[in-house]
């Protein structure tokens, strides 16, 4: 299901000069209490697409969401929109600094105010529309709202991978009115790595899956068992697998309704000849707290009133040994409670191992979410082959799901 991309459009000689191009970006950035952007990674990620369009002489109209401004009253169904703290105005300022050119900010995303800003654009200039989620119709994928948004432009570029798993007006709905609808450079790169790594990898292929709950990773584990040579599990989910084998887990997090599932996943790994590795030792704590008492124990010796919060040093060694020689490694989810420094050692060790593998020529893909934060925390983000910008979108793509924002694009 190959899709048209901005790269293929430009290389085919398509003339973008003077064309109004609606670009759906993901500018859902964190802001502090004063409205300052605390992390501009997502803005920087959109730069290659924006710069390619300005250089081609297009009139660039950027759109995005920020936060969750729409609040629905459960009792009455009444809708309130919280504009305070959710405006994209700070993004326009930062984008202008990064691009080295003015970015016109429209105080609305549809209607006369948006039209006035777009109409003033010259070739190679950039405008940013206000938060599309100020309209509840955005998340409802309302056709009339999508039509109004689309009426501002001549063609559509989706570069918001982080929102590609949502069928919203600005990610999917506008494609009914704007053709061609193509993938931007960021989306193209995400698809290339996250789909390519699973469908056509250099082998051996290993996946490392962490995180606190099996329930959130069922789909991805099931699919990976059909594709990988090795599967390494860490994070809070491991205790459900231990209890499924009759191992006592103390007060560790266990999803008792997923014990049968854990057994069936272990069985499936065996049937498929996948090497499934679980930690052999864990760092346990007497309570869930950064200052808790901690000790490292074998998985067969977890004290009754203690809880596991990280993988232990022997597990790190076993994981490092299993990863040696792997040509492709996909990682999603931390090995422990990495927000607490003393329970972050397992996650940090795996991050360093992947950085070394990258240096040795392996393809390493950090599949979104908390594992990205963990890699950034140890300053190794630039040492990986690819860091995904998606959370839920990365996970759904790894699960093999069709993402609505991608499905809606023009076929190649």
UniProtKB/Swiss-Prot annotation:
Protein keywords: ATP-binding, Cytoplasm, Glycolysis, Kinase, Nucleotide-binding, Transferase
Example GO biological process: gluconeogenesis
Group of enzyme by EC: transferase
Lineage: superkingdom: Bacteria
GO cellular component entries: cytosol
UniProt xrefs under InterPro entries: Phosphoglycerate_kinase, Phosphoglycerate_kinase_CS, Phosphoglycerate_kinase_N, Phosphoglycerate_kinase_sf
GO-annotated molecular function: ADP binding; ATP binding; phosphoglycerate kinase activity
Entry binding sites for substrate: 26-28, 42, 65-68, 133, 166
Positions bound to ATP: 217, 308, 339, 368-371
Any one Pfam family match given in the protein's UniProt record, by short name: PGK
Pathway field: Carbohydrate degradation; glycolysis; pyruvate from D-glyceraldehyde 3-phosphate: step 2/5
UniProt-annotated location(s): Cytoplasm
UniProt KW Acyltransferase keyword: no
EC numbers for this chain: 2.7.2.3
SUPFAM superfamilies, per database record: Phosphoglycerate kinase
Annotated catalysed reactions: (2R)-3-phosphoglycerate + ATP = (2R)-3-phospho-glyceroyl phosphate + ADP
Nucleotide-binding in keyword set: yes
Protein family (similarity comment): Belongs to the phosphoglycerate kinase family.
Oligomer status and interactors: Monomer.
UniProt-recorded name of the protein: Phosphoglycerate kinase
Annotated organism of origin: Synechococcus sp. (strain JA-2-3B'a(2-13))
